[in-house]
Every structure is written in C-alpha cells, then in structure tokens.
Curated annotation (Swiss-Prot):
This is Sulfur carrier protein TusA. It comes from the Bacteria. Pfam families: TusA (PF01206). GO terms for molecular function: sulfur carrier activity. Pathway: tRNA modification. GO terms for cellular component: cytoplasm. Interacts with IscS. GO terms for biological process: tRNA wobble position uridine thiolation. Belongs to the sulfur carrier protein TusA family. The keyword tRNA processing applies. The active site is at 19 (cysteine persulfide intermediate). Gene3D superfamilies: TusA-like domain (3.30.110.40).
Length: 84
C-alpha cells in the first residue's frame, strides 16, 4: 500500500502554532513553490481542519489528501496552476 503523504516536494511543520499562523505559513511556503509541486503540512491546531481546505479552495490549490482523525493532522496540497 502506498502512503500518499510519503514523498512531498516540500514539508511544513506547523506543530504548536495556532490560528492564523499555520495558514499564514502555508501561504508563504506555497508562494515560493513551482506550479504542480506538493506540500505536506503537519499541524495540531484543530482550526486547520477548516482553514487549510478553505485556503485551498480560495487560492485554487488542490487538497490531495488530509488525515485529521488524530493529531498530528496531515494535509497534502498541490500548488494550483494559476495560483500565486
């Protein structure tokens, strides 16, 4: 079985950070990525379960996977083609 979270292009450790810091860090990190690259976000703030999917929708990034059954939460995001 393949772990979709295993080989991201970049990883962002947002453990211990609280809203709005995780999403601010995601935005800053994604800004410096190439289109189509993937970012693994590791977080433990419950607000990320709402904020990261919302950020992806708003900024036209693709949320490829999320694991929010227990902490730390994991999210895999692909930078959108037209997103900045």
């Amino acid at each position: 079985m393949t772990d979709i979270f295993a080989n991201p292009d970049k990883t962002l450790d947002a453990l211990g950070l609280r809203c709005p810091e995780p999403v601010m860090m995601v935005r800053k990190t994604v800004r410096h990525m190439e289109e189509g690259q993937t970012l693994l976000i590791i977080a433990d703030d419950p607000a990320t379960t709402r904020d990261i999917p919302g950020f992806c929708r708003f900024m036209d990034h693709q949320l490829l996977a999320q694991d929010t059954e227990q902490t730390p939460y994991r999210y895999l995001v692909r930078k959108g083609i037209t997103a900045g």
